[in-house]
């Protein structure tokens, strides 16, 4: 097995669709801050969560710790409080009450987004009224959250009312495209089409808007309507581009029935028709076009078709990307053709493209299916010694492999490596480990990792609660369960109302 000579960013096949979604964006994106490492923000957020009292202000807590609140620190703190909306709002109102308020338009937008996620729209509207300076972004955040909550009519009304708060600055085509794009992404394509038909005279239209609507119909698996809008687009004098055709192609391939064989072949013919139409209009398929079709072949385990398509791609002078190679490697591994997959891995590196952890995960999943502990460990040790380090998903696959094989010492080794890695364990990691320990009746260890999971801020799945609960009772470990339940009650404030979604049904042995 060839070692990596260069670091590649992790890639997952679902990112292909996400990338297409990004490409067809109408041009307006919400520029909200992203979560960044910040020890001060961690300290403040944990202090507010632990010591929050709805009947007392939080000024003393912050002043006693001598904390100076900069705009960036406020943003990072609010991001860490996004799952505790009441505390986030109290913190924000405290900032506004200061003699020199340290709130900014960005912090207003953040709290509006946080409150919108939990449908506190009355509070959001009041905050917008109280804002000194609103921006188009403020209203588009509100529009997005209303649509996400299923309040589509209110979202359109908020879009229409925005100019009253923006000194009569009317929205343009780019913001109109954002409205349509958001409606389509949340599955309200029919309403998006209605809004488009009503207002296209006012806002106009372009290839991006039509591409958004075509993508919306594809999301609903209505390829017939997507093709109809493509025809309407051309008849309106707007030329489709390669992105438009890739969206349609992705819709056809994503909804493709892989079985029986007749249906799969029909979908292949439909995809080839899109390629033919592209060429007739003078548009050459690009690497994304080929990658979409390759991914469909890979899902159907059609190794020969996948390899032939890659050869055709190279013959046309199109260099495969890491996404393309990963699709082919996945197909070869799932078909049991590991030697060919390894040869392709060498070809990747020779072409200057280093496999990512996702590429290696294809091998690990095949080893898991084969119950090949030696093959998995050999590859894992090569990755550890190379430049491409295992991702959290890699560790999760390995944990599942060795838990199933009952090799708990190896599980411990992998878990220690995961905790020492840059990413660390996630919810899936803890879930796999706790369930695996329960299956081996290692109750003490299972309880320990269960508590650790909660302390790290991961809300366990209901099934995990029930598995541990029933297992402890069946094993006459009621005292252990009571101690564990007490710990859970102490930690429940971390999750707020979410914690209440996991009630325990009385269980009898």
Curated annotation (Swiss-Prot):
By its UniProt entry, which Gene3D superfamilies does this protein fall under?
Answer: Tetratricopeptide repeat domain (1.25.40.10)
Spell out the residue ranges that the record assigns to PPR repeats. 172-202, 206-240, 241-285, 286-320, 321-355, 356-390, 391-425, 426-460
Against PROSITE patterns, the record matches this protein to:
PPR (PS51375)
Annotated signal sequence is none
Could you point out where the transit peptide sits in the sequence? Answer: 1-19
The keyword Ligase appears for this protein: no
User: Pfam families annotated for this entry?
Assistant: PPR, PPR_2
Subcellular location, record wording: Mitochondrion
Query: Keywords in UniProt for this one?
Result: Mitochondrion, Repeat, Transit peptide
The intrachain disulfides are none
NCBIfam families recorded: PPR
Q: What is this protein called?
A: Pentatricopeptide repeat-containing protein At2g13420, mitochondrial
**What is the protein's species of origin?**
Arabidopsis thaliana
